[in-house]
Amino acid sequence: MNKPFIDVLAGQRQSVPPIWMMRQAGRYLPEYREVRAKAGGFLDLCFNPELAAEVTLQPIRRFGFDAAIIFSDILVIPHALGRSVRFEVGEGPRLDPLDTPEKISTLSGEADLSKLEAVFEALRRVRSELPQSTALIGFCGAPWTVATYMVAGQGTPDQAPARLLAYRAPEAFQRIIDALVDSSIAYLLKQLDAGADALQIFDTWAGVLSPREFARWSVAPTRRIVEGVRKIRPDAKIIGFPRGAGALLPGYVTETGVDAVSIDWTAEPGLVRERVQSKVAVQGNLDPLALITGGAALDQAVDDVLASYAGGRHIFNLGHGITPETPIAHVEQMLARVRAYKG
C-alpha cells in the first residue's frame, strides 16, 4: 500500500497534501499527559520503549495523520556522547557546558549508540502497529542546534554562547560539530534499520546565523549527514528544517541534497515556490498560534498555506511544534479543512 507522505518525498504531488504535526505527541493530548505522569521524567519517557511507542501512536489513533514521528529528543546524542543531560521541570534541558576549548577537548568523538537502544526498540514497536499507509519518521537535531545547547548548557534566547565560541575558537567549535555529524549519521542509520521510512534533521536555531556562518555551521554539517546516510542507504528520504533560514532556503536545499525542506510561517511564499519547491518538496507552514486561535482565523491561515504550496509537492504541517494549550477541536478543524482540499 502506498504511503502518501513518502510519495511526496519521492517526487509525486498528491491532490490532498499528506499531513502531520511537529510535536504531535505532546501535552495538548490528555492521553499523553496520562502516560507522561506514569513515566516520571521526560527522559524516562524517551527511554521507555513501551511508553515512547504508545505516545508516538496516540495522535495517529486520534487523528489519522499520514506520518508518525518517533517520540524522542534532539539531546539524546549528547547523552550518547557521554555528556550529562537533564531536564529540569519548568526550565528545560540542562547540560554540563562545553564553553571553552579546554572543556571541548574532553568530548568523546564517538557516540555509544547502545545508550539509545530504547529509541530503536520504540521504532520497531511503532512500525509493527502503524497502519500500512502511515509513514514513520526518525529524526535528529542538526549539529549547529545541538551544539548551542552543549556549549551553553541550556537553551538561550539568542544562542549567543555558541555563536561567540564559534567566532572566538572555530577550531574547537568544529570538534563539537564533527562529533555530532559522525554520531548523527550512525544514529539515523540505526533508525532506518529499526523501521523509519524517512528522516528529519531539525535545525531549530539556524535562523540566528549570518549567511557566512549559516553556510559553515548549518549547511555544511547537514550536507555531511545527508551524504553519510546516503552512502549506506542511497534511497534514504531526508527532510531538512532550517528554521528561520528565510532567503537562505534556496541555497540550503541546493547544497545539502535534502528531499524536502520544512519551512516556518515567516517564509515568503513566492520565493519558496519559485526557488525551493521547484527543486524539492515543501513541508509546512501553519503558524502554531493560528492553530490555537481556531475559528475563521484558522480557516484563513490553512487556506493561505494550501493556496501557496498545495499546487506543488507539499506536506501540510506547522511552522514549528504544536503548543500545549492548543485545543484538540482546532486540530480537528485544521484536519477537516486540509482533507476537504480539492487540488
From Swiss-Prot:
InterPro entries: UROD/MetE-like_sf (IPR038071), Uroporphyrinogen_deCO2ase_HemE (IPR006361), Uroporphyrinogen_deCOase (IPR000257). Its main location: cytoplasm. Its EC number is 4.1.1.37. It is found in: Cytoplasm. GO terms for biological process: protoporphyrinogen IX biosynthetic process from glutamate. One of its GO terms (molecular function) is uroporphyrinogen decarboxylase activity. Pathway: Porphyrin-containing compound metabolism; protoporphyrin-IX biosynthesis; coproporphyrinogen-III from 5-aminolevulinate: step 4/4. SUPFAM superfamilies: UROD/MetE-like. CDD domains: URO-D (cd00717). Keywords: Cytoplasm, Decarboxylase, Lyase, Porphyrin biosynthesis. Substrate binds at R23, Q24, A25, G26, R27, D73, Y149, T204, H320. It comes from the Bacteria. Homodimer. PANTHER family: METHYLTETRAHYDROFOLATE:HOMOCYSTEINE METHYLTRANSFERASE RELATED, UROPORPHYRINOGEN DECARBOXYLASE. Belongs to the uroporphyrinogen decarboxylase family. This is Uroporphyrinogen decarboxylase. The lineage of its organism: Bacteria, Pseudomonadati, Pseudomonadota, Alphaproteobacteria, Hyphomicrobiales. The gene is hemE.
